[in-house]
Amino acid sequence: IMINHIGHVPIDGQPPDKAWVEGMEIISKQPNIYCKASGFVELTKDKPSASELDYYRPTMDVLWNLFGINCLVYGSNWPVSERYASYQNVQQLAFRYFETKGSTAIEKVFWENSKEFYKWIDRY
């Protein structure tokens, strides 16, 4: 099961809602549960959305701590995200966060976990 758009928790630069954290904690312990790290900029409800990584960090830290390197999948949510931030800004926010977790995290979150979840087939 893929939880899309981080479970639609509102983002305001503060730690996320306690009930959301508790629910995500319960579901993250189940087998075969992935969470798509997408929708961050849309969930701020601000236009344009914040461009500083620290604004999103409290929510991203919760996701990292619950789903970790093996069950997070990056998604841009483009073109919907374009109403709140440029594609480049959305991707850079995610990249800057996950690069602090190491090169293996980048590979897992940006493509390997997606390949595993969606059962992508190599076509070359």
Over which residues does each language-model region extend?
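Catalytic pocket-lining loop regions of alpha/beta-barrel enzymes
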Residues: 1-73, 122
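Short Gly/Pro-enriched loop/turn and capping motifs at secondary-structure junctions
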Residues: 41-42, 78-81
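Mid-to-C-terminal alpha-helical segments outside catalytic/metal-binding sites
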Residues: 61-62, 66-73, 82-124
